[in-house]
Amino acid sequence: MSNRKYFGTDGIRGRVGDAPITPEFVLKLGWAAGKVLARHGSRKIIIGKDTRISGYMLESALEAGLAAAGLSASFTGPMPTPAIAYLTRAFRAEAGIVISASHNPFYDNGIKFFSIEGTKLPDDVEEAIEAEMEKELTCVDSAELGKASRIVDAAGRYIEFCKGTFPNELSLGTLKVVVDCAHGATYHIAPNVFRELGAQVIAMGCEPDGLNINEEVGATDVRALQARVLAEKADLGIAYDGDGDRVIMVDHEGNKVDGDQILYIIAREGLRQGQLRGGAVGTLMSNMGLELALKQLGIPFARAKVGDRYVLEMLQEKGWRIGAENSGHVILLDKTTTGDGIVASLQVVAAMVRNHMSLHDLCSGMKMFPQLLVNVRFTEGSGNPLENEHVKAVTAEVEAALGKRGRVLLRKSGTEPLIRVMVEGEHEDQVHEFAHRIAEAVKSV
């Protein structure tokens, strides 16, 4: 069991100005990471960020800490998280660092690391960084201080990488696409990718001001996108989250297409093209409809713990290549090393064009079970609600009522003080009743 103090399932995250997301902490983190990473020989780190106003402050603090440890930093400016993973590999940097809180509001921020391979740092490296944090900060000699530079063509490099994952023989010239960038890091990337591939692009959520990231736009709130798709009579809509590692889509009828459905489409297309290796990995939150639909196609399916790092770990264990969370993290190891919203959406659009099918029709082979997720906030330090006997008893009653045609999942968020209550079954009314019954039990603790 890990004893990590700061690193959660997706790096270090919190409210800006509150520990640990303070300038002092981030400077010390940069120094500690620099000391650990310098042991591997390289002296170059790539740093990117999303569009939050606090990114500039935290970027400066990180750079100061790295420089004090003797490591140089190359800055990309606002860039999607998967772009930093790609650029870290492309530049053979020792690590990449992203300053982002992904889908969270602007007042949150976080720090996430990528290894030289473009994957998230192993637990033992994160633990080594935390151990270094306990030491007194020292500065290398002036002649050995790290330097700062800017990668001026970072956006162009990543745009070309994304386009390179789309089949050369296909064109998007017939498609009208609404692209919602959540006022986040994809705002200057995604619309250009789709335009350069020939699509008619209607861009929204592309006016970041440092405060509006994820605000009623993007992958976590597709209502505006759904309305825009219908108003523009577009073929589809694509929504990314603030740092571009998630994607949710909308069909021409305004229906939401989530990560489970995206995984189904990509897996089925891989099977049709003879390119599917093994099976597909989802999570404990993946819809039962996905599992049943893949089973009908003869595609093996496995569930990992919630979190894209655990999806990746299971893919590596099994030697499979595709996995996703229903929240829209889609990992395609033949093309990327981490969840990449733009690359995933390109594979879905390629399936549409190749098969002359709408997004709605591509989803038709998978019947979604009604599923409800209720988030219940709890007070940290007051104990674990999941260990409460009343909560356990209510959960057991619901599981007995659902039988084999439904599921209950309770888990603590890895990034926020929340208990996530998920209930899934054949009947929507029953699912809602059971989910709220368990949620009330959690609230009563």
Curated annotation (Swiss-Prot):
It catalyses: alpha-D-glucosamine 1-phosphate = D-glucosamine 6-phosphate. Its cofactor is Mg(2+). GO terms for molecular function: magnesium ion binding; phosphoglucosamine mutase activity; phosphomannomutase activity. The active site is at 102 (phosphoserine intermediate). The modification Phosphoserine is found at residue 102. Pfam families: PGM_PMM_I, PGM_PMM_II, PGM_PMM_III, PGM_PMM_IV. Binds 1 Mg(2+) ion per subunit. Its EC number is 5.4.2.10. Disulfide bonds: none annotated. It is an enzyme of class 5 (isomerase). Keywords: Isomerase, Magnesium, Metal-binding, Phosphoprotein. CDD domains: GlmM (cd05802). Mg(2+) binds at residues 102, 241, 243, 245. GO terms for biological process: carbohydrate metabolic process; peptidoglycan biosynthetic process; UDP-N-acetylglucosamine biosynthetic process. This is Phosphoglucosamine mutase. It comes from Klebsiella pneumoniae subsp. pneumoniae (strain ATCC 700721 / MGH 78578).
